[in-house]
Amino acid sequence: MIQFTKMHGLGNDFMVVDGITQNVFFSPEQIRRLADRNFGVGFDQLLLVEPPYDPDLDFHYRIFNADGGEVENCGNGARCFARFVRNKGLTNKNKIRVSTSAGKMTLRLERDGTVTVNMGVPVLEPSQIPFKAKKAEKTYLLQTPQQTFLCGAASMGNPHCVLDVEDVANANVAEIGALLTKHERFPRGVNVGFMQVVNAGHIKLRVYERGAAETLACGTGACAAVVVGQIQGKLDQQVQVDLPGGSLTINWEGEGKPLWMTGPAQHVYDGQIQL
């Protein structure tokens, strides 16, 4: 039997598994089965806590999408990861350092129950996103057989494409997201953000996630949207990001600096399941 915890960050939900005190391995097929909301646990991502590879760090953090594929980063998951390792007694620290397949992150448990995550420095160089473009630009033209889109692009350890929309509530997220997430100019696929700028300190955002379709919240997507919005001269240093599942606060001092994301992490229940 595998012990697990169900958690969510703004409705972006996770199955969190302690891979330190129990020996676990998940095949892509097992993950797909567990992710099924009718026949399994049901989640957007599975989060796996592993021992650190680096003695200066506290944990290694792995993320698997509902389709079974491993991904580089998940901001909402990082907040739940921090709350989980603390609640389970795997650490007594308030400041937790972890590695992911994309790099290192610092997670900070706040007194009010929220978690602040150092999301790292955004990557804007196209080849590193990865995105096929000759050089970094504030906006790019993305052509499809149906229409041409204006977008910004950035990586937060995972690739993001951000579109400006006038009214996010009526944006065609499912259709356009499905069209762009596999666009040939993003060799590893891309998460697609639909951003409505309310004012310089406030945006509304919906995200079509690579491998998971639209989710209620996407932490890296919120960060990427703020980066693109700032670069395009539309946003301030601190921005409230309203997602369908709730709000995050993103702080970015500009190019070369890390982003800080603050938001909630909720425990739903503990369970056990036979693989």
UniProtKB/Swiss-Prot annotation:
Coiled coil: none annotated. Keywords: Amino-acid biosynthesis, Cytoplasm, Isomerase, Lysine biosynthesis. It holds the Pfam family DAP_epimerase. The record marks 160, 209 as: Could be important to modulate the pK values of the two catalytic cysteine residues. It is found in: Cytoplasm. InterPro entries: DAP_epimerase_AS (IPR018510), DAP_epimerase_DapF (IPR001653). The keyword Zinc-finger does not apply. One of its GO terms (biological process) is lysine biosynthetic process via diaminopimelate. The active site is at 74 (proton donor), 218 (proton acceptor). GO terms for molecular function: diaminopimelate epimerase activity. It catalyses: (2S,6S)-2,6-diaminopimelate = meso-2,6-diaminopimelate. Its EC number is 5.1.1.7. Substrate binds at residues 12, 45, 65, 75-76, 158, 191, 209-210, 219-220. The record marks 269 as: Important for dimerization. One of its GO terms (cellular component) is cytosol. Homodimer. Belongs to the diaminopimelate epimerase family. Catalyzes the stereoinversion of LL-2,6-diaminopimelate (L,L-DAP) to meso-diaminopimelate (meso-DAP), a precursor of L-lysine and an essential component of the bacterial peptidoglycan. NCBIfam families: DapF. This is Diaminopimelate epimerase. The gene is dapF.
